[in-house]
C-alpha cells in the first residue's frame, strides 16, 4: 500500500532523479547540469515565485500557478530585494541550462554524446517553445523593470540599460507584446506537452512510486507498460552504447526509437526485432525503464505464433545419461562446438567427478532463443520440461558451458536448491579444492568474456 516504508524512498528518488538527475551526472557532469538546471531550476522558480506572491499579498491563499504573471500585475507594489535576487538567480540558472541545451544540438560531443535523438514534429514544437519560454520571461520582466523600476541583478540591470538606451515610447509599445510572447510560449508548451517527449514530466514520478511498490512490466503487454513508454524523455543516452549503432551504423532501432514508435502505435516488427537484447541501453537509462522486457512483450504481441502444440512431443522424453549430483547442460552452442564438450569430459574425468549429462546425446534447448524471438509461451514449455528433468535426477549443482543457458537458468528457471555455475566457475572451484592439477606450459591462451556471462 501507499503508507509503506517504500514511500519516503520513492520521494527521495524523485528528488534525486527527476529534479537533480543523479544518473545523468554519472554519464557526463555537464549533461547532468543541463538537465538539472532545467528541471530543478524551473521547480524552484515555481516554488520561490509562489512564496514571493504569498508574501506580497499578505499571506493570503494563492494557487501554485499564481506567480506566473505576478510581475506583470504587481508593478506598483514595493519591491523586496531578497526575492528579486533569488528569482533572478534561479532564472539565470535555468537560462544556463537552455544555453547548454541549444549548444548540445550543435555539438553534442561536448557533453559526452556522439549521437542525439532525431525528434518527431511534436517534440520539435515543444522543444522550441521551451527554449523560448525563459528568454521571453527575461525580456518581459526586464522591460517591466525599465518602465517601473525594481528587479534584481539580472532583470534590474537589463531594465536599467533599456531605460537609458531605448526610447520610452518603444518600451511602452513593446511592453504588452513581450508579456504576450511569454504567455504564448508557455501556453504552447503545455498544449504540445501531451503529444511530445515532455509527457515524461508527469509519468516519470508516478513510475518511480509504482516501481517502489513492486510493480513491473512482464512478458505479456499490460497497462503498466504505458507508464514506462511515456516516461521516456528521449534524452538519447541509450543510443551511444548500442552496438548496432556504433559497429554497424543501424541508427533507427535503438530503445529511444522503439519506445517512441510503440507510444504512437506505429511500431514495426523490424524495430522490435532488430536488437541484441544485450541490456546496455537498460543499464544506462536514467529513468530505469525496463527496456528489454518491453521489447520482449512487443515481440510476443506482434509475432504470428504457429500452433502451440508443436512442442508437446518432447514431454516425457529423457535422453540424459549418467548419474551424479553434478549435472552438465551443454546447450545448443556447446553441441555445435564439440571440442568444448570433449574438453569438459576430460576435466570431469580428471577431477573424479561423477556427472549426470543432461543433453550429451541431444536434448531440449534452454528456451532463451525462442523467448527472445517473442514466443514466450513455447519457451516456457521448454523451461518447464528442463526443470522437471533436473528435479527428476535430483542434481544439486548444474554446470553449463553456454552463457545464454547460464543467464536463463539463473534468472528465469527458479531452480531453488540447485546451484548454477558456468564451467569457468566450476573449474576454478576444482582447482581451489585441489581436485584439478595444473601444469605450467609455454602456450598462450585468449579468453573471451561473453556478454551474457557478464
PLM features per residue range, with description:
Residues 1-223, 239, 299-302:
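Membrane-embedded alpha-helical bundles of multi-pass integral membrane proteins
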Residues 18, 22, 209-212, 245, ...:
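A short secondary-structure junction motif
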Residues 28, 263, 374-375:
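Short, solvent-exposed helix-helix connector turns and helix-capping sites enriched
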Residues 142, 149-152, 201-202, 209, ...:
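Flexible loop/turn segments at secondary-structure boundaries
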Residues 162-170, 218-220, 283-284, 291-454:
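Iron-sulfur cluster-binding electron-transfer modules in prokaryotic oxidoreductases
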Residues 212-229, 237-284, 288-316, 378-381:
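Ferredoxin-type iron-sulfur electron-transfer modules in oxidoreductases and energy-metabolism complexes
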Amino acid at each position: 500500500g501507499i503508507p509503506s516504508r517504500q514511500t519516503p524512498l520513492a520521494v527521495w528518488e524523485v528528488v534525486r532523479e527527476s529534479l537533480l538527475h543523479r544518473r545523468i551526472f554519472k554519464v557526463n557532469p555537464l549533461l547532468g547540469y543541463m538537465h538539472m538546471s532545467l528541471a530543478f531550476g524551473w521547480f524552484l522558480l515555481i516554488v520561490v515565485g509562489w512564496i514571493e506572491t504569498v508574501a506580497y499579498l499578505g499571506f493570503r491563499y494563492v494557487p501554485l500557478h499564481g506567480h506566473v504573471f505576478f510581475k506583470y500585475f504587481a508593478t506598483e507594489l514595493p519591491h523586496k530585494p531578497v526575492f528579486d535576487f533569488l528569482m533572478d538567480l534561479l532564472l539565470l540558472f535555468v537560462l544556463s541550462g537552455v544555453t547548454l541545451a541549444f549548444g548540445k544540438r550543435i555539438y553534442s560531443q561536448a557533453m559526452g554524446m556522439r549521437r542525439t535523438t532525431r525528434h518527431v514534429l511534436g517534440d520539435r514544437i515543444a522543444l522550441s517553445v521551451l527554449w523560448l519560454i525563459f528568454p521571453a520571461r527575461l525580456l518581459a520582466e526586464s522591460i517591466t523593470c525599465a518602465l517601473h523600476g525594481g528587479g534584481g541583478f539580472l532583470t534590474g540591470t537589463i531594465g536599467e540599460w533599456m531605460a537609458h538606451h531605448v526610447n520610452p515610447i518603444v518600451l511602452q509599445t513593446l511592453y504588452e507584446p513581450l508579456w504576450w510572447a511569454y504567455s504564448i510560449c508557455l501556453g504552447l508548451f503545455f498544449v504540445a506537452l501531451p503529444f511530445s517527449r515532455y509527457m515524461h514530466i508527469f509519468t516519470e514520478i508516478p513510475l518511480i512510486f509504482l516501481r517502489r511498490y513492486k510493480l513491473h512490466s512482464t512478458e505479456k503487454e499490460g497497462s503498466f507498460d504505458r507508464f514506462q513508454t511515456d516516461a521516456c524523455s528521449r534524452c538519447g543516452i541509450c543510443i551511444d552504447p548500442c552496438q548496432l549503432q556504433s559497429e554497424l551504423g543501424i541508427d533507427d532501432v535503438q530503445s529511444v526509437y522503439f519506445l517512441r514508435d510503440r507510444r504512437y502505435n506505429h511500431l514495426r516488427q523490424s524495430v522490435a526485432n532488430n536488437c541484441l537484447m544485450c541490456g546496455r541501453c537498460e543499464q544506462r537509462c536514467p529513468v530505469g525503464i525496463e527496456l528489454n522486457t518491453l521489447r520482449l512483450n512487443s515481440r510476443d504481441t506482434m509475432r504470428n505464433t504457429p500452433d502451440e502444440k508443436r512442442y508437446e512431443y518432447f514431454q516425457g522424453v529423457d535422453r540424459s545419461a549418467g548419474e551424479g549430483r553434478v549435472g552438465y547442460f551443454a546447450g545448443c552452442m556447446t553441441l555445435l562446438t564439440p571440442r568444448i564438450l570433449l574438453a569438459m569430459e576430460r576435466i570431469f574425468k580428471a577431477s573424479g567427478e561423477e556427472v549426470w549429462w543432461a543433453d550429451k546425446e541431444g536434448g531440449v534447448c534452454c528456451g532463451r532463443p525462442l523467448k527472445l524471438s517473442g514466443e514466450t509461451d513455447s519457451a516456457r514449455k521448454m523451461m518447464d520440461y528442463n526443470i522437471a528433468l533436473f528435479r527428476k535426477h535430483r542434481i544439486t549443482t548444474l554446470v553449463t558451458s553456454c552463457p545464454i543457458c547460464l543467464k536463463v537458468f539463473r534468472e528465469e528457471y527458479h531452480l531453488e536448491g540447485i546451484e548454477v555455475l558456468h564451467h569457468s566457475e566450476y573449474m576454478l572451484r576444482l582447482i581451489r579444492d585441489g581436485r584439478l592439477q595444473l601444469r605450467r606450459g609455454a602456450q598462450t591462451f585468449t579468453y573471451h568474456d561473453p556478454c551474457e556471462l557478464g
